[in-house]
Structure formats: C-alpha cells, structure tokens
Amino acid sequence: PVAAINGYHTCGSNDTLASAHPSDSRKGHDMTTSSVSPVTTELAGSETGITLVIHAGAGSRGKHSTPERIAQVELDLQRALDAGYQLLESGAPAHEAVVAAIHVMEDAPEFNAGRGAALTSDGIAQMDACLMTGDGEVGAVTGVSTVKNPIDAARAVKEQTKHVLFADPSDAEIADWGVATESNEYFITEQRRQSLAEAQSGGDEWEKHGTIGAVARDAEGNIAAGTSTGGITNQMHGRVGDSPLPGCSTFAN
C-alpha cells in the first residue's frame, strides 16, 4: 500500500514531519522530527502494525518563528499525533485517525490550515482540504471560508455525496453535511494580517510551504491520507492550489 501527502514542490528543507509507529523508542506514539522528503513519509512505520505520519509545513518554522513559537509547534504536533494514534490503538479506521490529527493542526493557529490560514489579497481565509482512502474513495473542498475544520467538509463530500470535489460550497450544502462553521474572522490571526501587509507592500508575496497533512495505516492494513491548507499569502480570490486535488497533493492506494 502507498500513501503520500504533498508533492516535492510544496515541501522544503525546513518542513516539519512527525511520525508514530510501533518501532518508536517508547510507547508507540513518541514524536520524531526530521527534514526529509515526502518519499520518506510513504515508508515510515513497520511492515505490519499501525502507523501515523503527520506533516506541518515549513511555514510553521518561517521567518516569524521564535523559540517559543517552535516549542508550541512541537507541542501541537505531539497533540496531533496523540489524537490520531490513540484512535488507531483503539481499532479505529485509518481515515478517522487522519481526520483527528488534522483537526488538531487546523485548530492550532501556528499552522497554515483552519485557524491561522494564510489570507487572500482580499484579506480573508480561503481554505482547501482533501481526504482519500486506500480503496480509491476521495472527497475534497476548495475555497471554503466558514467551515471550522475543512477536513470535515472533505470527509462529508467523500461520504455523503456522489462527487469528488466541491468548490466554494453553499451555506445550505455545508449545513446539510452537518459540519461546524465559524465566521471568517475566527480564522484570521494577527500574524497572518502582518504577513499579508508585508506581501502587499512588496515583501515575500508568495509565502509557501504551508500545507498540513497526515497519513495513517490501521490495524487491518487500510490506509488513508489527508491534506488541509490556507493556500498562499496574498493569493487572488478563487485560486486553487494542489492541496484539494487527488493525486497532486494527496493519494492513497
């Protein structure tokens, strides 16, 4: 089985990866971080047993990083691992572990997904997410601006519709899916406002390396992968990147 999150073009040498699997030194869900390519994420874990790998994006260690921020990033990564791995230990399917881990990162303002997402040129958070399982079933959303956890909307597309990708789904569709919502202001942080102002004043306009993701293998050998992102700082409204496109940033087979 193969699962992958993010292509080479979205991973940089400062990307933060963390993995949890039975061969770790302590009880299964210890965190290890390294600067490795996405190929390594495909190979993490043992030939048998449960595995969880998460990816936080190099933006979490960008130019605004401080020792305190890096410490918070590492704490949130551990929380994400714990959330997903505990589900795998309890016998939950791989996709539930992926969603749980991504939830934690979407809720943490340090990452470019959910709360803390990069802002468009209009100053709003416009988010994308994708979830795929090893049986080929996939769901994705792009351009959501009020879904608290975009990965939930991607899961809803996968499980509740006959389609693969929804662009800017309506409020009625989101309500039918039963996913939690927030006003767009909820997603906007002061750091993201500053990043947008810098970009619009001639700074680093294309602040990249922000997609988060997770890959899991459950006790039955099933695999799943998911990604979530706020895109690129100062992107035009309506831009669609690779993150919600199956086979581009997310793949499980």
Predicted regions and their residues:
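Alpha/propeptide regions of enzymes that mature by internal proteolysis
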Residues: T32-N253
